[in-house]
Swiss-Prot record:
<keyword id="KW-0436">Ligase</keyword>
<dbReference type="GO" id="GO:0006412">
    <property type="term" value="P:translation"/>
</dbReference>
<dbReference type="GO" id="GO:0006450">
    <property type="term" value="P:regulation of translational fidelity"/>
</dbReference>
<comment type="subunit">
    <text>Heterotrimer of A, B and C subunits.</text>
</comment>
<keyword id="KW-0648">Protein biosynthesis</keyword>
<dbReference type="GO" id="GO:0070681">
    <property type="term" value="P:glutaminyl-tRNAGln biosynthesis via transamidation"/>
</dbReference>
<comment type="similarity">
    <text>Belongs to the GatC family.</text>
</comment>
<dbReference type="GO" id="GO:0005524">
    <property type="term" value="F:ATP binding"/>
</dbReference>
<dbReference type="InterPro" id="IPR036113">
    <property type="entry name" value="Asp/Glu-ADT_sf_sub_c"/>
</dbReference>
<keyword id="KW-0067">ATP-binding</keyword>
<protein>
    <recommendedName>
        <fullName>Glutamyl-tRNA(Gln) amidotransferase subunit C</fullName>
        <ecNumber>6.3.5.-</ecNumber>
    </recommendedName>
</protein>
<dbReference type="Pfam" id="PF02686">
    <property type="entry name" value="GatC"/>
</dbReference>
<feature type="region of interest" description="Disordered">
    <location>
        <begin position="47"/>
        <end position="98"/>
    </location>
</feature>
<dbReference type="GO" id="GO:0050566">
    <property type="term" value="F:asparaginyl-tRNA synthase (glutamine-hydrolyzing) activity"/>
</dbReference>
<keyword id="KW-0547">Nucleotide-binding</keyword>
<comment type="function">
    <text>Allows the formation of correctly charged Asn-tRNA(Asn) or Gln-tRNA(Gln) through the transamidation of misacylated Asp-tRNA(Asn) or Glu-tRNA(Gln) in organisms which lack either or both of asparaginyl-tRNA or glutaminyl-tRNA synthetases. The reaction takes place in the presence of glutamine and ATP through an activated phospho-Asp-tRNA(Asn) or phospho-Glu-tRNA(Gln).</text>
</comment>
<dbReference type="GO" id="GO:0050567">
    <property type="term" value="F:glutaminyl-tRNA synthase (glutamine-hydrolyzing) activity"/>
</dbReference>
């Protein structure tokens, strides 16, 4: 299997909105090759006889019942906010900007 190219790393970086330097492209290309190789080795071992798992140990969620408790009033919650609007925290817009 051919290795990951600098162009492929640059494409992935653009998709992730990352700006990488040329030397970082080389570095990450090597790292991605190592990761893909490790996944390929695991795929070779994984067989129909091996059940898929998401964790090596059995896990169970510990749930507790929801309880309604007193909480902060909107005024108390917003008392330390640098900016607020209509009983909400006002923050700088980040989506939709280029």
């Amino acid at each position: 299997m051919p290795g990951i190219t600098r162009e492929e790393v640059a494409h992935l970086a653009r998709l992730a909105r990352l700006e990488l330097k040329p030397e970082e492209l080389e570095h990450f290309a090597g790292q991605l090759d190592d990761i893909i190789g490790a996944v390929a080795r695991v795929s070779e071992v994984a067989d129909q006889d091996v059940p898929p798992t998401s964790h090596p140990l059995p896990l169970t969620n510990v749930m507790r019942p929801d309880e309604v408790r007193p909480s902060l009033t909107p005024e108390q919650a917003l008392s330390g906010a640098p900016a607020q609007e209509q009983q909400r925290f006002k923050v700088p817009q980040i989506l939709g900007e280029e």
